[in-house]
Curated annotation (Swiss-Prot):
Known function: F-actin cross-linking protein which is thought to anchor actin to a variety of intracellular structures. Association with IGSF8 regulates the immune synapse formation and is required for efficient T-cell activation.
Main localisation: cytoplasm
InterPro entries, sorted: Actinin_actin-bd_CS, CH_dom, CH_dom_sf, EF-hand-dom_pair, EF-hand_Ca_insen, EF_Hand_1_Ca_BS, EF_hand_dom, Spectrin/alpha-actinin
Regions annotated as coiled coil: none
Subunit (UniProt): Homodimer; antiparallel. Interacts with MYOZ2, TTID and LPP. Interacts with DDN. Interacts with PSD. Interacts with MICALL2. Interacts with DNM2 and CTTN. Interacts with PDLIM1. Interacts with PDLIM2. Interacts with PDLIM4 (via PDZ domain). Interacts with IGSF8.
Keyword entries, A-Z: Acetylation, Actin-binding, Calcium, Cell junction, Cell membrane, Cell projection, Cytoplasm, Cytoskeleton, Membrane, Metal-binding, Phosphoprotein, Repeat
Organism: Bos taurus (Bovine)
Family the entry assigns: Belongs to the alpha-actinin family.
UniProt-recorded Gene Ontology molecular function terms: actin filament binding; alpha-actinin binding; calcium ion binding; protein homodimerization activity; protein-membrane adaptor activity; tropomyosin binding; vinculin binding
Modified-residue entries (Phosphoserine), positions: 6, 471, 677, 890
Superkingdom, taxonomy of origin: Eukaryota
Locations listed in the record: Cytoplasm, Cytoskeleton; Cytoplasm, Myofibril, Sarcomere, Z line; Cell membrane; Cell junction
Protein name per the record: Alpha-actinin-1
Keyword Mitochondrion listed: no
Length: 892
């Protein structure tokens, strides 16, 4: 059988799966684990003639880790990698981890990279996994798991010792007595246990650790001070150390195993005997309870009152809820115990159990069946009796409820039917009262069924000789008499409501006609007042003319509006005549509108007053718009001249910069004269600014007489000045380049001609392909092969350092001047510094100050980095990096 099958693997690895790795962040626990795990590893590595000092460092290359596994397993691992690279280390660690996994161990979140990186938490977790697999897994006491078996072994070995109570692998060991007890139990000559004191843990711990190391060959894996100074010592460190004691004393286990075997047999026999006694007692108690309960359930004596029957039902419910469930459980447990006992006896080769007479499981089941039958008959009888009494109580309660509901419904109904609220109501209120009365009639008809039900229930109670029948009959008669009276009052009120409705309908029609015509006329007047008082905002002559035309059209509608006003007032006067003639009691005003004749007359007068005010406002605005139009035309006339002039000058400058002839000095003089002529145009720009200021003050936002805005003119003017200044600057830079590089005028003209030839869009710049064609025309050998492409990329990085994708003429001139003239280089400067330094690779401060002018010497001293070569002397400076930095080949 495989000792490391899946079941055992799960058992001994259970602590690892439950291990909270974050606890390793506790410095005290980490310290204990470091020391314990290091000592445990060294106790095995010393067999191979080696050891470790730093647990997270010495296992990083995987060599000692593989050696440790070979020692503790007695097996050979794959040949390790001897290289020093990270990949070799990871390979070795993976071989070790694969070997551990092959033993049925689950490696939870442990990877080779973390071990190689020296991750303390992962390294300690890996060593703990190894300890579990190879030092603790095989520990088993009475079929317990590894951890529980080790704990049980400790408890049994220390049980006879006072002040020792091993419950765990942390605080139970803090006083040191547990370690001393383990040693004394197996080697009593090594420790005088009677002299140990519980209040002196340091002495106890040091005594146990020293004796174990000296006489038992168990290395010292813990520090007494660390255990005492920690509230909860690390469980894994304690388990590792205690497992060493277990293996050291494993020889003493044989006698204990034999004793355990005998105890186990006796325990099984005692347990079986106890189960037999429990069965007999439980069966006797259950049968006695059934015997007492059946007569109670067979009692069928009836009760006269509902309360008494309900009490019997409540007692029966208590029996079902409180008394019977525990007995059901006892019966079930009795059967379970019987079956369990028979199984245990059969498995342990004992004879089957035979209960005493009358206490067999079948006897109990028969008695229980009799109980169930009596219980069922008793429950049916209770329910029938309760139903019989409930019927009478239900009918009486039903009569009272229906009578109460009917009486509550009729309360106030007679007073409501006698009131004359319709005499002062409006037509809508009359119609509402009629609808309400119709609803009441429907409600009255619906309640007819309830009255009939009340009479029928009273009749049934009389037939069943209900004890309180007289009061029921009196109440029923009163309800019937009241019902007849409500019917007569209902008919009388309907007739009165219908008469009043007809009288008010005529007035209502006139009110409705008034409202239909008054509302739109009122809206028209309100709209007219809003329009006449509306603040208009216009920007053109056309807009103000449109407003004036609309106002004249409005004034033409006023006579017809006045006729409509008089017609509406005539309807109101007709209503007043009808009210006076027929003495109608009007409770309120027109229900269809809140508009009164007084409001109509008041708003009409207001409209007549607003018309001349609107006339005056439109006249004043018309004059203002005429003035604004003159300002627009004045600005447009000037802008239409200045705008094209600026555009023309911009185009001329573009042509001049491309088509310049003569010497650079002649071109520069020509450009400056051209710039002067442009600057002399400034007064016209200022005059246009003045006109623009007047337009802004007049709040004029558009101008159909020109497409040019002042902002457009300003931007164009600034661009014009900037362009001529930039062109002059380019010519000045060309002169500086020519003089500095010794370029002749013929070369400059040739460069300009070549550049202009390939600048086909006259933009003043060359694209990459245009620039490449230009270089080829000047004799550069730039092919389409990889070498040619690389050379062209190098040149582009010089002329277009910002990678804008274009080459300016100035960049072109700079490049051509560097290509055709002698230049100084970083190598030349380094060679010069080497001469000053006496052929050394560095230079000193004194040499710089002796050979160079003071200001230049201090400049070099402040910027040169210290020289760090093997031949450096104090104060040596690195002139090589300084020289390359001067030419942008490194950082200065």
């Amino acid at each position: 059988m495989d000792h490391y099958d899946s079941q055992q693997t799960n058992d001994y690895m259970q602590p690892e799966e439950d291990w909270d790795r974050d606890l390793l962040l506790d410095p005290a626990w980490e310290k204990q684990q470091r020391k314990t795990f290091t000592a445990w590893c060294n106790s095995h590595l010393r067999k191979a003639g080696t050891q470790i000092e730093n647990i997270e460092e010495d296992f990083r290359d995987g060599l000692k880790l593989m050696l440790l596994l070979e020692v503790i397993s007695g097996e050979r691992l794959a040949k390790p990698e001897r290289g020093k690279m990270r990949v070799h280390k990871i390979s070795n660690v993976n071989k070790a981890l694969d070997f551990i996994a092959s033993k049925g161990v689950k490696l939870v979140s442990i990877g080779a990279e973390e071990i190689v990186d020296g991750n303390v938490k992962m390294t300690l977790g890996m060593i703990w996994t190894i300890i579990l697999r190879f030092a603790i897994q095989d520990i088993s006491v009475e079929e317990t798991s590894a951890k529980e078996g080790l704990l049980l072994w400790c408890q049994r070995k220390t049980a006879p010792y006072k002040n020792v109570n091993i419950q765990n692998f942390h605080i139970s060991w803090k006083d040191g007595l547990g370690f001393c007890a383990l040693i004394h139990r197996h080697r009593p000559e090594l420790i005088d246990y009677g002299k140990l004191r519980k209040d002196d843990p340091l002495t106890n711990l040091n005594t146990a650790f020293d004796v174990a190391e000296k006489y038992l060959d168990i290395p010292k894996m813990l520090d007494a001070e660390d255990i005492v100074g920690t509230a909860r010592p690390d469980e894994k460190a304690i388990m590792t150390y205690v497992s060493s004691f277990y293996h050291a004393f494993s020889g003493a286990q044989k006698a204990e195993t034999a004793a355990n075997r005998i105890c186990k047999v006796l325990a099984v026999n005692q347990e079986n005997e106890q189960l037999m006694e429990d069965y007999e007692k439980l069966a006797s108690d259950l049968l006695e309870w059934i015997r007492r309960t059946i007569p109670w359930l067979e009692n069928r004596a009836p009760e006269n009152t509902m309360h008494a029957m309900q009490q019997k039902l409540e007692d029966f419910r208590d029996y079902r809820r409180l008394h019977k469930p525990p007995k059901v459980q006892e019966k079930c447990q009795l059967e379970i115990n019987f079956n369990t006992l028979q199984t245990k006896l059969r498995l342990s080769n004992r004879p089957a159990f035979m209960p005493s007479e009358g206490r067999m499981v079948s006897d109990i089941n028969n008695a229980w069946g009799c109980l169930e039958q009596a219980e069922k008959g008793y429950e049916e009888w209770l329910l029938n009796e309760i139903r019989r009494l409930e019927r009478l109580d239900h009918l009486a309660e039903k009569f009272r409820q229906k009578a109460s509901i009917h009486e509550a419904w009729t309360d106030g109904k007679e007073a409501m039917l006698r009131q004359k609220d319709y005499e002062t109501a409006t037509l809508s209120e009359i119609k509402a009262l009629l609808k309400k009365h119709e609803a009441f009639e429907s409600d009255l008809a619906a309640h007819q069924d309830r009255v009939e039900q009340i009479a029928a229930i009273a009749q049934e109670l009389n037939e069943l000789d209900y004890y309180d029948s007289p009061s029921v009959n009196a109440r029923c008669q009163k309800i019937c008499d009241q019902w007849d009276n409500l019917g007569a009052l209902t008919q009388k009120r309907r007739e009165a409501l219908e008469r009043t409705e007809k009288l008010l309908e005529t007035i209502d029609q006139l009110y409705l006609e008034y409202a239909k015509r008054a509302a739109p006329f009122n809206n028209w007047m309100e709209g007219a007042m809003e329009d006449l008082q509306d603040t208009f905002i216009v920007h053109t002559i056309e807009e103000i003319q449109g407003l004036t035309t609309a106002h004249e059209q409005f004034k033409a509608t006023l006579p017809d509006a006045d006729k409509e006003r008089l017609a509406i007032l005539g309807i109101h006067n007709e209503v007043s005549k009808i009210v006076q003639t027929y003495h109608v009691n009007m409770a309120g005003t027109n229900p269809y509108t809140t508009i009164t004749p007084q409001e109509i007359n008041g708003k009409w007068d207001h409209v007549r007053q607003l018309v001349p005010r609107r006339d005056q406002a439109l006249t004043e605005e018309h004059a203002r718009q005429q003035h604004n139009e003159r300002l627009r035309k004045q600005f447009g006339a000037q802008a239409n001249v200045i705008g094209p002039w600026i555009q023309t000058k911009m185009e001329e400058i573009g042509r001049i910069s491309i088509e310049m002839h003569g010497t650079l000095e002649d071109q520069l003089n020509h450009l400056r004269q051209y710039e002067k002529s442009i600057v002399n145009y400034k007064p016209k720009i200022d005059q246009l600014e003045g006109d623009h200021q007047l337009i802004q003050e007049a709040l004029i936002f558009d101008n159909k007489h020109t497409n040019y805005t002042m902002e457009h003119i300003r931007v164009g003017w600034e661009q014009l000045l900037t362009t001529i200044a930039r062109t002059i600057n380019e010519v000045e830079n060309q002169i500086l380049t020519r003089d500095a590089k010794g370029i002749s005028q013929e070369q400059m003209n040739e460069f300009r001609a070549s550049f202009n030839h390939f600048d086909r869009d006259h933009s003043g710049t060359l694209g990459p392909e245009e620039f490449k064609a230009c270089l080829i025309s000047l004799g550069y050998d730039i092919g389409n092969d990889p070498q040619g492409e690389a050379e062209f990329a190098r040149i582009m990085s010089i002329v277009d350092p910002n990678r804008l994708g274009v080459v300016t003429f100035q960049a072109f001139i700079d490049f051509m001047s560097r290509e055709t003239a002698d230049t100084d280089t970083a190598d030349q400067v380094m060679a010069s510094f080497k001469i000053l330094a006496g052929d050394k690779n560095y230079i000193t401060v004194d040499e710089l100050r002796r050979e160079l002018p003071p200001d230049q010497a201090e400049y070099c001293i402040a910027r040169m980095a210290p020289y760090t070569g093997p031949d450096a002397v104090p104060g040596a400076l690195d002139y090589m990096s300084f020289s390359t930095a001067l030419y942008g080949e490194s950082d200065l």
